[in-house]
């Protein structure tokens, strides 16, 4: 791979890239299109790790995505400055920052309500549906898309098909930004066989022609049938997510009183050492722990960002060859790598086991089971031109102009249902499930 091709400004759905406006490049337009999309806006009412809370300090998918985008921009700009002489003459180092920032903004845009619990619930429902014979009309590859449902593949569909120009390029982002978004540039046929990325994939069968087009435009080498090497900038987006995930989980753990401030402080001090800002040294006992943590977190992110940028530059040849094993965190050195790994371990041991989170996950399964039974059941009932019951007709009416056609293949009809359900916020999904079961909230 080479940077000239990897950083193309050409857009999906348009034969040539549009002219840059004064102070606004093609990549800035990508950023703006994502920010103003309905799918991005709805992240504000979707679970990050913990249930959407009355405590406004707890992260949602939206605040998490914004923070990841900030770190991703810094990573892209630092790498761009270091590699300035290797970039195309029309490309400014800051362009790398905007590309990575945009991909970071969109990295969770396909996640269903209730976060990873929602993904698990959808996969579990389709496994049961397969046992009932509901998926028998599909090919093995199509059936696999549902059995391995993945927010990353749904996000790719949102960006390339559903938002703005429906089924005509979607958001029509540049190929460079789409390539940087594609964390897993392969289909579900590889979801069981790729080591540390096991169970992950980034593209449904319905979007495979678009994936082929994008990888061809970017010069991403094909490794196997329906599998391509990753765009190098994906590793910066992934590192930004890892950095924020690790630190954000600890902050939320403190807010929910699942962790002691002293253990979080010790972890971050182990990373930054004596490199503390004067504002931190001047803090006294009357200063809040939130203020202390904010200052310490900022310095920690600086250290982790520097370490990730160094790892990227050190591994540039392997990245361009499409053969880097693992993620950038694995290629960091010293305290930075240990900090991220230890932060994730603390989250697994002390945060993810919280009773409130467990109850939320159980509720997610119940809610999504109700919705999938209703909408997929109605789509199945009318499949092949059969006349659905009155109830099923009313259920399909809720989809409006996006309701599946009775003559469509069942794969396409179920995808249309998933588009609707995966796009819901936690609160909307919960309320609709309540109303469908006759248990709507009292007026």
UniProtKB/Swiss-Prot annotation:
Domain of life: Bacteria
Keyword Hydrolase found: yes
NCBIfam families referenced in this protein's UniProt entry, alphabetically: dGTP_triPase, PRK01096.1
Family note: Belongs to the dGTPase family. Type 3 subfamily.
One GO MF term attached to the UniProt entry: dGTPase activity
Record GO biological process: dGTP catabolic process
SUPFAM superfamilies according to UniProt: HD-domain/PDEase-like (SSF109604)
Matching HAMAP family: dGTPase_type3 (MF_01213)
Chain ranges of the HD domain: 61-246
Alphabetized InterPro entries for the sequence: dGTP_triP_hydro_central_sf, dGTP_triphosphohydrolase_C, dGTPase, dGTPase-like, dNTPase_3, HD/PDEase_dom, HD_domain
UniProt-listed CDD domains: HDc
Protein name: Deoxyguanosinetriphosphate triphosphohydrolase-like protein
Record key words, sorted: Hydrolase
